[in-house]
């Protein structure tokens, strides 16, 4: 079970993931969570850093598909601002959202990575679906009420898997 809860990579934030790294890993498609992964959970709009990163992905023929458990209007708003497709409902960690996202791309599972901030939804779901994963630190220390219980168990699991200093696992940057 721990293998499905073990991310392929730890990275502090999405914007530290370089195009060169993705190409070296033969990644053609990114499935990405929204809240506290790409956008602060309590912010409505995307920011310039995210817009630039997504534009760089597009220029390098790396597609991004949003897979979120949030409300449809939230997902649509972010997807529209970024000009990317999305899946609703995500239903992570179940495979329904991942299957739908896979049907929207020509990439194989080996060419896809899921980027998310939650071990029990993003990483577990993608891991059991058979795709690579990047666990990022949440953009904000606070969470929506519905997420707080997950965070408690995630911290417990990460401590069991990696020890008290598991936060040292996060890389500053993935570049090559």
Explain the meaning of each model-derived region.
Residues 2-30, 43-44, 51-62, 67, ...:
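Asp-based, Mg2+/Mn2+-dependent phosphohydrolase catalytic module
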Residues 33:
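Active-site residues of response regulator receiver
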């Amino acid at each position: 079970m721990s293998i499905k809860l073990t991310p392929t990579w730890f990275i502090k934030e999405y914007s530290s993931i370089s195009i060169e790294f993705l190409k070296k890993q033969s990644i053609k498609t990114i499935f990405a969570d929204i809240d506290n992964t790409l956008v602060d959970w309590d912010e409505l709009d995307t920011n310039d850093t995210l817009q630039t990163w997504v534009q760089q992905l597009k220029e390098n023929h790396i597609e991004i598909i949003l897979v979120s458990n949030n409300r449809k209007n939230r997902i649509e708003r972010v997807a529209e601002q970024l000009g990317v497709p999305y899946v609703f409902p995500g239903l992570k960690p179940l495979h329904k959202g991942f299957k739908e996202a896979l049907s929207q791309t020509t990439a194989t599972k080996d060419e896809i990575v899921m980027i998310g901030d939650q071990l029990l939804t993003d990483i577990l779901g993608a891991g059991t679906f058979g795709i690579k994963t990047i666990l990022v630190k949440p953009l904000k220390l606070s969470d929506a009420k519905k997420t707080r219980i997950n965070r408690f168990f995630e911290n417990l699991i990460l401590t069991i898997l990696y020890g008290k200093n598991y936060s040292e696992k996060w890389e500053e940057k993935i570049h090559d």
